[in-house]
Amino acid sequence: MNMITFMLLLSLTLSIILTTINFWLAQMNPDAEKLSPYECGFDPLGSARLPFSIRFFLVAILFLLFDLEIALLLPLPWAIQLSQPLLTLLWTSILLLLLTLGLVYEWIQGGLEWAE
């Protein structure tokens, strides 16, 4: 058995054992104190479980999408050196066009407006 297979089996076995022990030893008796929000040791001034703005959530999701776009485009200089650089540039252009159209759509729909 080669070393990679051994390490994969060892990590899988260890993960399964630790997860099983965690579920077996965990205390499953939540009370009001455990379910209350923690605010750095101070008594909460109000309800700490207030909903946050949907606009904030939308802007955060858009940030994650465009951050992922940057991560997908980072290996582009090395991908151009492959056997078919035109195909690589075509797929890159399609990805950029799709994300740009999505951004324009969100802008037109008013999804990027912070205040209404």
UniProtKB/Swiss-Prot annotation:
Task: Select a single GO molecular function from the record's annotations and give it.
Answer: NADH dehydrogenase (ubiquinone) activity
Transmembrane ranges? 6-26, 56-76, 85-105
Record localization: Mitochondrion membrane
Q: Which reaction does it catalyse?
A: a ubiquinone + NADH + 5 H(+)(in) = a ubiquinol + NAD(+) + 4 H(+)(out)
Membrane topology reported for the UniProt record: Multi-pass membrane protein
Q: What is its main location?
A: mitochondrion
EC nos: 7.1.1.2
Top-level EC class, please? translocase
User: Would you tell me the Gene Ontology cellular component terms?
Assistant: mitochondrial membrane; NADH dehydrogenase complex
Query: Which key words are in the record?
Result: Electron transport, Membrane, Mitochondrion, NAD, Respiratory chain, Translocase, Transmembrane, Transmembrane helix, Transport, Ubiquinone
- The protein's superkingdom reads Eukaryota
Q: Which family does the record claim for this protein?
A: Belongs to the complex I subunit 3 family.
Q: What is its biological role?
A: Core subunit of the mitochondrial membrane respiratory chain NADH dehydrogenase (Complex I) that is believed to belong to the minimal assembly required for catalysis. Complex I functions in the transfer of electrons from NADH to the respiratory chain. The immediate electron acceptor for the enzyme is believed to be ubiquinone.
Q: Which PANTHER family match?
A: NADH-UBIQUINONE OXIDOREDUCTASE CHAIN 3 (PTHR11058:SF9)
What name appears for this protein in its UniProt entry?
A: NADH-ubiquinone oxidoreductase chain 3
Organism per entry: Struthio camelus (Common ostrich)
